[in-house]
């Protein structure tokens, strides 16, 4: 199993979701901390300003479907663009390409009656469910399978959020 840490950000809800999934024992580090001894760093809200670390895999959660809508205010960009499907992307952060290989994506529909706050809330819900499960697959050296989203399998009494135990 890979040793990983979360890089702190203002996105406390996703940090809490990751901690909950893994039983609350995952280190939360600051950008200036030493990353020695970690195989994986999990970003929780950084844009392309985060610099890759030698010999450490880095992943990020992006609140739209890449490769569309990169940079600042991507949620607003996606919502105002008129797209009917947006979503969440989990991607690798690579040395010369912050938006590296896409590891997983999950759609969020934007209907005619969807307002911006509902859209943002749905993006956050999907991110809190998808990201911990992708992290779990990476640290256990398995390929992420979307069926995992619908089956129990996390560390809290064997459930991934589909029952009353994880509410």
Language-model segment annotations:
Residues 1-167:
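One-carbon transfer enzymes
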């Amino acid at each position: 199993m890979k040793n990983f840490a979360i890089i702190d950000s203002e996105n406390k809800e996703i940090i809490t979701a990751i901690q909950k999934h893994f039983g609350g024992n995952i280190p939360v580090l600051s950008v200036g901390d030493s990353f020695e001894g970690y195989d994986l760093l999990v970003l929780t809200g950084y844009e392309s300003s985060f610099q890759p670390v030698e010999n450490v895999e880095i992943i990020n959660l992006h609140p739209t479907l890449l490769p569309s809508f990169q940079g600042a205010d991507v949620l607003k960009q996606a919502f105002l663009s008129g797209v009917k499907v947006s979503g969440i992307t989990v991607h690798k952060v690579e040395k010369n390409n912050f938006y590296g290989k896409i590891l997983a994506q999950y759609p969020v529909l934007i209907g005619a009656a969807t307002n911006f706050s509902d859209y943002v809330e749905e993006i956050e819900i999907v991110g809190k469910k998808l990201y911990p499960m992708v992290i779990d697959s990476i640290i256990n050296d398995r390929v992420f399978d979307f069926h995992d989203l619908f089956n129990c399998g996390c560390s809290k009494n064997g459930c991934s959020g589909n029952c009353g135990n994880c509410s």
